[in-house]
Amino acid sequence: MNDNNNEIDQLIYLFSKLPGLGSRSARRIVLYLLQDKDVRLKTLINNLTEIDKKIVKCQVCGNMDTENICGICTSEYRDKSVIAIVETVAELWAMERSGNFKGLYHVLGHNLSAASRQNPSILRLPELLDRCFKENIKEVIIATNSTLEGQTTAYFITEYLKDHPAKISRLASGIPIGGELDYLDEGTLSAAINLRQPFE
């Protein structure tokens, strides 16, 4: 690109920062949008504008929805005695795609890194403990990733919840060490949910 296309370069740069996209893929996407600007680009702009106006974080679990309390939290068909703890909304959506988990969720928003010595206060654990007592939770499924950070976070959560009587379990087989839930296929994730084990 040359200096006369600063806006295009900036758009390519922004797309290249999205997960899974490099500069070459970003360039192809921008070119695709610009080749039919009146339809493709304007449709994308309109959709992004609507999302910006309407999407909010669920005040209970941390999911993304159009309502302050999301459809999962308000559903009468969910098992409200079981709660899965996930690191981000991406993992929540992955578990929903599996179609195998019918309980509630709690999104931490972060994980803990032993190397960087992060403050555990970045996790939404006081809200989690409050929910466990108020909602009479019987089982807490720790569904953090199988990375070192995910394991560190899982152990910290277990210690934090030790005074609550709920059974604490962890997703089981099928998740490789270092694996992230969002990248697993639905079948593997379903097996991990069904074969979850007590956390020790």
Curated annotation (Swiss-Prot):
Annotated keywords: DNA damage, DNA recombination, DNA repair, Metal-binding, Zinc, Zinc-finger
InterPro entries in UniProt: DNA_Rcmb_RecR, Rcmb_RecR, Rcmb_RecR_Znf, TOPRIM_dom, TOPRIM_RecR
Pfam family, any one: RecR_HhH
Zinc listed as a keyword: yes
NCBIfam families, alphabetized: recR
Function: May play a role in DNA repair. It seems to be involved in an RecBC-independent recombinational process of DNA repair. It may act with RecF and RecO.
Name of the featured protein: Recombination protein RecR
UniProt organism field: Rickettsia bellii (strain OSU 85-389)
